[in-house]
């Protein structure tokens, strides 16, 4: 990969998309919630307990191991598609944790560090352009062009190959902040 200027970026999507980990390590789940089944769909409806030190120890251990396996220096942590209302809203110890940390609403959890690289996969190009203008670097993986597990009739491979990751209308001075593109594949759909 390095010879072809490709950085392989592993993704461990947390705190959502965590059913397999929670089934394997039940101590990571919210105590009041039943164990999820291991699904074969994009949205598993499970989330770690954000108040548990065991959660952070587990995630830290996984990230440390990934960092030793992938030399690119970047790990994608996802952070999307968490069903906050279903799993965290109304849970007293989570609400107490949020209050203690000064987190007023669940969307406040989505604030980004200024150094965060944004992996743009869905929504208006204006969102990504604004993030770039605010100083973020972006990987453009807009789903209608880069999700290579889609039916060949809907997204021919030739269309993915021809995709230009620089957003239309992005001022040239920002082009270097577009790091490239990512192509996604979900093997359960192949």
Predicted regions and their residues:
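Substrate-binding groove of N-acetylhexosamine-processing glycoside hydrolases
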Residues: 52-76, 81, 99-190
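Substrate-binding cleft of carbohydrate-active enzyme catalytic domains
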Residues: 1-105
């Amino acid at each position: 990969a390095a010879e072809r200027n490709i950085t392989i970026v592993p993704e461990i999507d947390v705190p959502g998309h965590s059913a397999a980990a929670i089934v394997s390590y039940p101590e990571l789940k919210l105590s009041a919630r039943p164990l999820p089944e291991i699904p074969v769909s994009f949205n598993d409806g499970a989330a770690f307990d954000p108040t548990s030190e065991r959660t952070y120890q587990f995630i830290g251990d996984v990230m440390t191991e990934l960092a030793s396996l992938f030399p690119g220096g970047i790990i994608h942590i996802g952070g999307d598609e968490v069903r906050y209302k279903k799993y965290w809203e109304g849970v007293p110890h989570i609400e107490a944790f949020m209050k203690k940390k000064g987190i007023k609403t669940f969307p406040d959890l989505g604030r980004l560090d200024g150094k965060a690289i944004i992996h743009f996969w869905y929504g208006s190009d204006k969102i990504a352009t604004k993030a770039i203008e605010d100083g973020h670097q972006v990987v453009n993986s807009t789903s209608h062009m880069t999700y290579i597990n889609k039916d060949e009739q809907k997204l021919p491979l030739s269309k993915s190959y021809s995709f230009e990751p620089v957003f239309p209308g992005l001022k040239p001075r920002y082009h270097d902040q577009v790091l490239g593109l990512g192509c996604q594949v979900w093997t359960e759909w192949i």
